[in-house]
Amino acid sequence: MRGAILATAAALAGTAMADVAHMRRHGHDSFHQRRAAVAEADATCGCTTEVVTVWGPPTLIPVATPTPSTVTSEAVTTLHSTSTSTVTIVASASTPATSSSPATPKVPLPTPAITNFPSTGVYTIPATTVTVFDTTTVCGATTTELPAGTHTYGGVTTVVETATTVVCPYATVEPSGTTVTSVIKTTTYVCPTPGTYTIAPTTTTVPTSTVVVYPTPAVITPGTYTQPEQTVTVTRTDYTYVCPFTGQNEPTSAPAAPSTTAVPATTTAAVPSTSSAAPSSSSTAPASTGAVGGQMGMTYTPYTKGGDCKDKSSVLSEVANLKSKGFTHVRVYSTDCNSLEYIGEAARTSGLQMIIGVFISSTGVSGAQDQVTAISKWAQWDLVSLIVVGNEAIQNGYCDASTLAGFISSAKSAFQSAGYTGKVTTTEPINVWQAYGSTLCGVCDIIGANIHPFFNADVSADQAGKFVAQEIKVLEGICPGKDVLNLETGWPHAGNANGKAVPGASEQAIAIKSIAQEVGSKSVFFSYFDDLWKEPGQFDVERYWGCIDTFN
């Protein structure tokens, strides 16, 4: 009997679909494509037939299947060469490992304590005291609230006046098992042209408003540091709070000064000389002696109701009116609309002192550098009692605390090089000072805060002054030994109520009188006119803070 087995293998022709994977991480968009090879147009299909004939009784013939061999091809590209030394310690759970030499105990350092509160309520963080014997660079902690979108934060900000190579430490995080560890690293950065550079920042995208925590370099000097007991009122879920240490030797929160090496330039620009020397700064910051009553200053913006720049004659007459109302200072937020020239001329004629500002917008500190340059060139220091770098820049998410501290330090150096000997600060709400005082205290000569009692729903107009005084008392404990100025305060005369805080013309008059009686000598009232060019804002009050007519 003859049995035959016919084994036929047919080739299959087909197509494959291409797919595209879109990945996003830290603001960098990458596109990866995977496509199947396309058959040539002239390719044909073929068949191979194999016939095996076996004589004998029918039976099954096993067909041996060859064992496939695996060939692996790898292409290796070395981006960074790193040499590491790993020590593995294995300890028995029942018998502790012994060593011939005692292990060095871990020395606690006064790094900020990070606490996450999952729910709302009032929490108390106990006090802690740490003594440091050696100078150490550590990773501090900073938080910032980011609105939905892509943001860049952290890093070390430096200003260079020539092509320079900068060597500086920076803080970052590295994976450690299932967690991450904050570490200090050193980087070399080439600044090809003069300007402001932020070294080793972090870029991320958040779908909703998010509070992020990131490391910042800090130098801890020998001394005793105390983290005082803190009572925190949490009004939102999943809230992160950073509790800083303070001590007799306040840690330097700003990054260590980078060392620089000048890069040879092809051309050298000569610094223009001038025959007239800039007037030196003979005035000091507005007095903060603890006296109450009075009206130190008022904010002034040279904009029309439509947001355009006012003409010079309007600015001169309006600023002169401040003097007749009994004010001694005028606060200016930025250098646009010829603010320095027009308001400066009016201040000199009227005998007013100026609190001038460097406004940081959504473009960050790099976009504010031109204002630093403009102020340094203007240099009418005898008119200036204080320079405010940033107005709620952290609160608005325009930069983080570490970046702001670095920018304040570099701006102060630029002003001093131009002859300024007065004080420099920034201004933020009290919650920002509480969270980032350890970062800002070292670079600010005084504490500048914007204290608006209207935004506390439990404060009525007649209690506005007492509320502001209490807030100032709290601020005085954040940077010990430094004065506090209330650089923006007032009450709206129109809009919607916020609990007990009710806007209105009579309520505005009551609130401003209360603030003036309690802390008027250390307060700047907001603002000269209504800002009708602004968005309505929360409670529809943002446009209606004009209060010049409240003062006789």
Swiss-Prot record:
Family designation: Belongs to the glycosyl hydrolase 17 family.
Enzyme type, top EC level: hydrolase
Catalysis: reaction(s): Hydrolysis of terminal, non-reducing beta-D-glucosyl residues with release of beta-D-glucose
PANTHER family, sorted: FAMILY 17 GLUCOSIDASE SCW11-RELATED, GLUCAN 1,3-BETA-GLUCOSIDASE
Protein name per Swiss-Prot or TrEMBL: Probable beta-glucosidase btgE
Span of the signal peptide: 1-18
GO annotation, biological process: cell wall organization; cellulose catabolic process
Entry annotated with the keyword DNA repair: no
GO molecular function terms noted in the UniProt entry: glucan endo-1,3-beta-D-glucosidase activity
Stretches the record annotates as Disordered: 250-291
Enzyme active site: 392 (proton donor), 488 (nucleophile)
Keywords, in A-Z order: Carbohydrate metabolism, Cell wall, Cellulose degradation, Glycosidase, Hydrolase, Polysaccharide degradation, Secreted, Signal
Main location: secreted
CC annotations in GO: cell surface; extracellular region; fungal-type cell wall
EC number(s) given by UniProt: 3.2.1.21
